[in-house]
Amino acid sequence: KAIGEPMIQLVTAQELRLNLGDDSFTGDIDDAIEEIRRDFMKPEIECVMEMVAPDGSIIDHFDGRTLNPGHAIECAWFILWEAKLRGNDPDLIRTGCQILDWMMARGWDGEYGGLFYFRDVYDKPVQEYWHDMKFWWPHNEAIIASLLALSLTGEEKYATMHQLVHDWAHSRFADKEHGELYGYLHRDGRVSVPLK
């Protein structure tokens, strides 16, 4: 099973609760967060899996070992947003920040900067040839997540994280001549395709 399903459940229930004024959707949100914690968060190896077996165990195969740092960081800010909506719920803040911390550590490229698109949970080869490219959207997710983490915790490390991702992304993805962002960079930060 994939983490996308509880993530979609979480964010959809947030929108339905807000727009319909129906607090019964909070139960759906709680269920989604519980599934993410129980099945996809792996504290023993400090990561969030993209896909797991039905029982939450890691599948030792290319697809099963794949980490998608940007997607997990998006999950972090969905949870942090719910924490904010609940009056800064400390348990949800811990969960969201833990996901953010783990996946920034797993996903940040120590040599060239930026977030890798895919990683292997055991640092084995990754199946997808674009695994080491830098896509625009994971950086946007990290900018949002780090800013939310900073606003909820006041911890300086999230200000530093936010500045790091913001500066790296804006210095490489931004088209300074025509505006907007390029979508895809090579690992070293060079524009791969000038599409927007």
Q: Which stretches of residues belong to each language-model region?
A:
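Glycan-recognition and catalytic cores of secretory/periplasmic carbohydrate-active enzymes
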Residues: 1-196
